[in-house]
């Protein structure tokens, strides 16, 4: 059974109670940590406390479950008018190629805080073709700059 969950802003149920499908406690935060560790080189070794902060400060959070296992995740931030950013979109390697990534991205883009935003940004290392299938376009007139602490 597939469940696509549109969490409330800040994902309180997932953060504090580990809730998954049907509001059942599933140790969801630990499962999210494992999903990221196993499937996203850029998100390995995130601590539970950092994930809680990350979720608390996210505007839109979507998770995809097969039974009681989380197999997909994505989140977004937006000012609701001019700019938004999609973050941490990941699908478990055993579930790729099933359309789950598109489900998550489309759910994020339809969210109230995102749907009327003029420009939605995302960064990808090796999934440019995937995102181009969902109408994201490469921009060569801008450069990505990073300030790291």
Where are these regions (language model features)?
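Conserved active-site alpha-helix within GNAT-family acetyltransferase domains
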Residues: 114-149
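Short amphipathic alpha-helix that is part of the acyltransferase structural core
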Residues: 1-48, 142
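Short alpha-helical functional segments enriched in proximate histidine and acidic residues
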Residues: 111
């Amino acid at each position: 059974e597939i469940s696509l969950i549109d969490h409330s802003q800040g994902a309180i149920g997932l953060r504090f109670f580990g809730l998954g499908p049907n509001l059942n406690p599933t140790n969801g935060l630990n499962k999210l940590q494992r999903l990221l560790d196993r499937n996203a080189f850029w998100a390995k070794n995130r601590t539970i406390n950092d994930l809680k902060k990350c979720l608390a400060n996210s505007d839109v959070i979507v998770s995809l479950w097969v039974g009681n296992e989380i197999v997909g995740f994505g989140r977004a931030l937006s000012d609701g008018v001019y700019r938004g950013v999609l973050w941490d979109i990941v699908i478990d390697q055993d579930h790729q190629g099933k359309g789950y990534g598109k489900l998550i991205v489309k759910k994020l883009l339809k969210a109230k805080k995102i749907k009327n935003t003029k420009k939605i940004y995302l960064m990808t290392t090796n999934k440019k073709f995937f995102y181009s299938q969902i109408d994201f376009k490469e921009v060569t007139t801008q450069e990505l700059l990073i300030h790291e602490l």
